[in-house]
From Swiss-Prot:
Its main location: membrane. The keyword Kinase does not apply. InterPro entries: PBS_linker_dom, PBS_linker_sf, Phycobilisome. It is found in: Cellular thylakoid membrane. Phycourobilin binds at residue 49. Contains one covalently linked phycourobilin chromophore. This is Phycoerythrin class 2 subunit gamma, linker polypeptide. It comes from Synechococcus sp. (strain WH8020). One of its GO terms (biological process) is photosynthesis. This protein is a bile pigment-bearing rod linker polypeptide that associates with C-phycoerythrin. It is a peripheral membrane protein. One of its GO terms (cellular component) is plasma membrane-derived thylakoid membrane. Signal peptide: none annotated. It comes from the Bacteria.
Length: 293
């Protein structure tokens, strides 16, 4: 039996380098905040994935197949709760600290009371007026999408098609539907679950990432921990890189022609003299129907 100094709770509390996590025992794993239609569909799929018992976690390729996670322990202490709230504000709001009047105190109280999970808290912060004022109304469409990915999934968009799909979703169903789709996605569920605050995950070799993910996240200011995303401008930081990658993917593959030696064909020629036309073989005269001669 583990002692107090070596218990799971003590070990987790001592690990400060890992992601911030907090477990709500009463309703862990359930979304208890209002969802849009897109969010309801994503939530339905998420519950089916959860029922399958698939391993959770970011799936570090360097650990496969030696480390497979089927469950994850999250602390439920007051210190863990405080750490989660601070980390969520920093991550979701792009390192832009709100004032006391701008904080979502109602969400904080519900999280403290165990009424919502960390996932719901993150979802609520991304739908707040403070977030919309800084990362929706004040920026361009592609800039807003790339910040949504950075804040909620811990990565930059992988390609231009991913950006276009989410811009279309936002235009057709609204901003809240976009947020629900991201926080209720299978990717969010697998990597962060219901208890972990999103974090930058492009520094390691995670499953599904490509080699330019690190550079795209660097363009988004992922390495600038002392600068807020709001201070880095309103224009997209990844539009040129994604456009170049899109052009490269659609460029036709080079090929070479192989020369073929052509052999000239000489047809035999009929030669005759005088007025005698050469006789034709196998000639059948045409006879109209009913005429005989």
């Amino acid at each position: 039996m583990l002692g107090a100094e070596t218990s799971l709770q003590a070990l987790t509390s001592a690990t400060r380098t890992g992601p911030a996590a907090f477990s709500t025992k009463s309703k862990a794993g359930k979304n208890t905040v209002p969802r849009t239609v897109a969010g309801a569909i994503a939530e339905y799929k998420r519950q089916h994935c959860a029922a399958m018992g698939i391993g959770i976690g970011p799936r570090l390729l360097s650990e496969c197949p030696f480390a497979v996670t089927f469950d994850r322990y999250s602390p439920d202490s007051s210190a863990a709760l405080e750490r989660v709230i601070v980390a969520a504000y920093r991550q979701v709001l792009g390192n832009l600290p709100p004032t006391d009047n701008q904080r979502e105190t109602s969400l904080e109280v519900r999280l403290m009371n165990g009424e919502i999970t960390v996932r719901d808290f993150v979802n609520g912060l991304a739908k707040s007026d403070f977030y919309k004022d800084n990362f929706f109304h004040a920026v361009g469409a592609q800039r807003g999408i790339e910040l949504n990915f950075k804040h909620l999934l811990g990565r930059a968009p992988l390609n231009q098609q991913e950006v276009q799909n989410h811009i279309k979703l936002q235009a057709e169903e609204g901003f809240d539907a976009l947020i629900d789709t991201l926080t209720d996605s299978a990717e969010y569920t697998e990597v962060f679950g219901a208890d972990i605050v999103p974090y930058d995950r492009t520094k390691d070799s995670y499953a599904g990432m490509n080699t330019r993910s690190f550079n795209l996240m660097r363009d988004l200011g992922g390495m600038k921990v002392a600068i807020s995303d709001n201070a880095q401008g309103r224009q997209s930081k990844t539009v040129n890189a994604l456009a170049s990658a899109s052009r490269e993917s659609t460029k036709p593959q080079p090929f070479s022609y192989v020369s073929v030696t052509q052999i000239p064909v000489k047809l035999p020629q009929q030669q005759y003299t005088g007025h005698n036309v050469p006789a034709m073989s196998d000639y059948v005269p045409f006879r109209p129907f009913g005429i005989f001669f």
